[in-house]
Amino acid sequence: FSIREADVHLAAGLPLTWIRNQREAFRSYLLQNPEVHYRFNGKEYHLHFAGCSLYPQGYPAIVNHLGNFKGTNLLADIGNGTMNILYINNKKAQESRCWTEKLGVNQCMIAAKNAVLDKFGVKIEESTVEQILRFGTADISAPYLDCISSIARQYVAELFSTLRKYEYNPDLMRLYVVGGGGCLIRNFGTYDKSRVTIIDDICATAKGYESLAYMSLKRRG
């Protein structure tokens, strides 16, 4: 049994600093085709787009954790190209206190590859660097591992320095980290683990979009 035709309500996200000004334009873009027909694995499918809900990127990933939020909390969504920062006070997102910094994981990747090239005169596979960033180690010789680890530690230090620029104080608030950058903080950061929560679930954002959209549609009846 499989569903081949359905009404679909889209739930998606925009960068925090874009959500106010671009929400309606992006909604119109996503709904420009009221229905689509396509073939997948030899079967025909037909979707009708019934609506679209848009949310700030990052925030949906922590929706299921809001029950634990008290007072002031800071959310850092560290993606491939950017880091989105959002304050959440008493479980409510503060849209006036959100920022986007071009400090994504790819910057660390580029810096690590360049460091190896500069120091050893060789090019290193991106997949090898990715393994080190994700797991903290790889099957390479110690000098190369030390070089890349040093760059990763510098990158994480810069992340925390940037957060402090926006008044992050671990003694006064808890930090929640989502996105691919969380593994770098875990592997190469120096922080109070009791005050920082790293959400590893790669589906957390998608689950959050679904939960928020479902609650919104339920309220409308």
Where are these predicted regions, by residue range?
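Nucleotide/phosphate-binding catalytic cleft detector across ATP-hydrolyzing
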Residues: 1-73, 92-107, 127-221
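Phosphate-handling catalytic cores of nucleic-acid transaction enzymes
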Residues: 76
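Short beta-strand scaffold segments in enzyme catalytic cores
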Residues: 83-87
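Acidic, metal/cofactor-coordinating or nucleic-acid-engaging core segments within structured domains
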Residues: 113-119
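Short, basic interhelical loop/turn and adjoining N-cap
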Residues: 120-124
